[in-house]
């Protein structure tokens, strides 16, 4: 009965070094704004209705014509959104958020051309800002590493063991933690909250952290549903990055007394 004593090992080898990949690539859509027919004010109206008010591109075009008398195609609205996302993404990704030492991570699914894709989110559980995100066609460890790298990059000095990273029970997170220790010598505490009920002391203590990012997922999904899915991988990434810009800098939050999470002087003095 030798088969009873056979040992099985799972061996993982990464063919891509996710720690050398560029976190902040420049999109081909990142160009200057030149308006042939419309102007920056109309573009601002497009983004306000489309992103802030959760309207689809067709609904946005319809409202602009019915309310403002501006005849614009839904394709132009989509192009404005893609260009704005490409231009503002570097600012959002490299802003100094001054994060706390409790991060929360989760993933949710979206559709790209009818095929399931995944959005990875890492947020500051205390200050509520989104620090890292990725869009991928798989639920593998690679995109998880990239999202975590983007979040850790916000620290001027990595806190090490003082950092508590809270996630669900998915296996990608401990594998990513292992790679950070091997490749960058970054050690941090990973806490996995498993299940929907508090069956153990860990879940009871850190359930609130997990619920913060789950509420964020629901907030994003309410804006995502009107899109009926994205048309390309790049469109999905830049569509989500535009929503992150709105969430971090424009959306009123009860946590901050119904003011945006990160207030900018340039926005405070700007008119509508």
Language-model segments: what does each one mean?
Residues 1-51, 70-73, 98:
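Basic, short loop/linker segments at the boundary and entry of helix-turn-helix/winged-helix-like folds
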Residues 57-70:
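DNA-recognition alpha helix
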Residues 71, 79-98:
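Short, basic alpha-helical nucleic acid-contact segments in DNA-binding proteins
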Residues 82-83, 133-158:
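Active-site beta-loop-alpha junctions of metal-dependent nucleic acid enzymes
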Residues 98-112, 121-123:
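Two-metal-ion RNase H-like nuclease active-site motif
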Residues 159-174, 194-196:
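Acidic/histidine-rich, metal-coordinating catalytic segments
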Residues 202-205, 209-232:
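Active-site proximal helix-loop segment of RNase H-like, two-metal nucleases, encompassing DDE(D)
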Residues 226-230, 237-272:
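C-terminal domain-tail junction helix/linker
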């Amino acid at each position: 009965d030798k088969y009873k004593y056979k040992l099985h090992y799972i061996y993982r080898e990464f063919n891509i070094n996710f720690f050398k990949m560029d976190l902040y690539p420049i999109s081909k859509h990142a160009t200057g704004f030149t308006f042939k027919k419309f102007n920056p004010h109309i573009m601002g109206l497009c983004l306000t209705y489309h992103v802030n008010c959760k309207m689809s591109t067709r609904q946005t075009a319809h409202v602009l014509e019915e309310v403002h008398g501006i005849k614009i195609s839904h394709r132009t609205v989509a192009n404005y959104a893609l260009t704005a996302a490409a231009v503002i993404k570097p600012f959002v990704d490299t802003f100094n958020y001054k994060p706390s030492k409790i991060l929360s991570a989760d993933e949710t699914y979206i559709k790209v051309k009818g095929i399931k894709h995944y959005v990875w989110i890492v947020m500051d559980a205390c200050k509520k800002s989104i620090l890292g995100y990725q869009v991928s066609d798989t639920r593998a460890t690679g995109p998880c590493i990239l999202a975590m790298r983007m979040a850790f990059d916000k620290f001027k000095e990595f806190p090490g063991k003082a950092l508590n990273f809270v996630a669900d029970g998915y296996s990608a997170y401990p594998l990513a933690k292992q790679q950070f220790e091997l490749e960058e010598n970054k050690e941090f505490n990973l806490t996995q909250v498993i299940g929907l009920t508090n069956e153990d002391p860990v879940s009871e203590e850190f359930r609130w952290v997990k619920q913060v990012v789950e509420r964020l997922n629901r907030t994003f999904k309410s804006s995502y549903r009107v899109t009926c899915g994205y048309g390309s991988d790049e469109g999905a990434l830049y569509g989500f990055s535009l929503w992150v810009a709105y969430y971090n800098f424009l959306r009123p939050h009860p946590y901050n007394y119904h003011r945006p999470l990160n207030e900018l002087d340039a926005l405070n003095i700007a008119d509508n």
